[in-house]
Amino acid sequence: MTDLNEKGRTPPYKDIVEYNPDGSIRGTYYMADWIKDTNTRVLNLTHNDLDGAVAGIVIKNVYPNSVQVPVNYKGGPDYANAIQCIAAKRQYQAIIFSDFCPDDEMLDAVHAAGKCYLVIDHHQTAKVCDDDPYGTYYVREGKCGALLCYEYFTKEIGLVSGLENLEWLCEVANDHDLWLRKILPLSDDLNTIFYEYGFDTFMEKFMNGLPREGLSEEAKELLANHEYEVDQYIAGCVQKDLPHNGHYIECDKFNSDINKRMTPMYDWLVMAGTEGVDPGMTKLSFRTRRNDINIGATLKELGRGGGGHPAAAGQLIPTEERDEFIQTVGDLLFEK
């Protein structure tokens, strides 16, 4: 990766414009300076899951003036909201994308706003535009987005210190996101708590990290009520078996719980949901227990904007094409 200081001294592409309240220009400064200035007003677009939320917590601790905006699949309302946030260019100075890599449409919006940006991501399907003079990319596989954010700001560029209270939270998020399963049941429980609280409340509750002595009594009570709700929900879901020892289930919530319960039972699992996406679209989440197939690479090969990890990946698809697409994915995964 190009050195930040060297890369940040390439005007005019790296200039950030600072506005006065009346709209007049106060001044400009270089991209490298904004990364090193913890007072920068950052628009943080981060993946709407446990990993993305913890990444947002790290960034909020590094840049107190940052605003965290959750983003999920293209085609959903949160994606459209992210584009609108980028367009509101006087509300922020620079952008950090955490736990996901912006697509072409999002980068077009960034360029139209004339803003510099930083990408911190770990997904195998991340599209790195290292020649973009507006952008700096820190993309590394093997660690989740939250842990990469923590290590980037505290170790890679040494911008801040005193965030040791967040390291354990990042490690637990890493255990869940990469499916390492070495910190069970805590990592699964933390993911459940994320979905019970929702993005904003979770960030508020864990802004100072996760105590090593365990979860709060409030969080434990949430977990106690959760299992019964999951049982009742799954019982009412549309389900069917798929070829190649697969299973299909229509679900718009409790996806992590369904994944945890069903993935060990099948060679591949497909969870289909329509909540939070545009009408006529379906969000497909693919999972596998096998280490000899690569779902993320298969979705990327199909060239429709999907992707993710070898064992877990997603795709937004027109509902009318859903069944045919699932069959195509299954054939590619198991008949090569």
State where each predicted segment sits.
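An accessory alpha-helical subdomain
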Residues: 185-229, 243, 247, 251
